[in-house]
Amino acid sequence: MNPTVYLSCLVVFSLFYLGKAQAENDDEFATEKQRLLRVYGDSSVDEATRYRNVDDLVKFYDKYSTLLPLKPDLTQRAQDLVRRYKEESARVVLVDGAPAQGGFWLPLVKLLIVQLGVEIASEGFKRAIES
């Protein structure tokens, strides 16, 4: 096969593959964003559900923080809380694969993250209504 044709096919295939991967990431971002907005933006969702989704919210923020148009003060608070949450999670002692009972700081940090998630969701709804 002619090297020029081969390279052209390789470039076209690479661009197609990269475009498909980007589209999948965009779909994943949009799907997870909508799910978390429903959890933290809907006042009918109970606190237990919000607490169960803290890990997902932290992972989402870690992965997509650059794509979220947050105000600088919210961005700073989110970064601080995520950092503290990770530090406290790393300190958790597991007994037979489950966290030991007790502890004060991790539930407090989770509470702050839930409150921040609700605040970010309401900010997102405000921006959606304004535009």
UniProtKB/Swiss-Prot annotation:
**Metal-binding listed as a keyword:** no
Q: Name one GO cellular component term.
A: extracellular space
Q: Which residues form the signal peptide?
A: 1-23
Which keywords label this protein?
Answer: Immunity, Innate immunity, Secreted, Signal
One of the GO BP terms on file: cellular response to heat
Q: Where in the cell is it found?
A: Secreted
Function, in words: A humoral factor that may play a role in stress tolerance. Requires Mekk1 expression in the fat body to regulate response to septic injury and consequent immune response.
The entry's protein name is Protein Turandot M
* Taxon lineage: Eukaryota, Metazoa, Ecdysozoa, Arthropoda, Hexapoda
Name of the gene this protein is made from: TotM
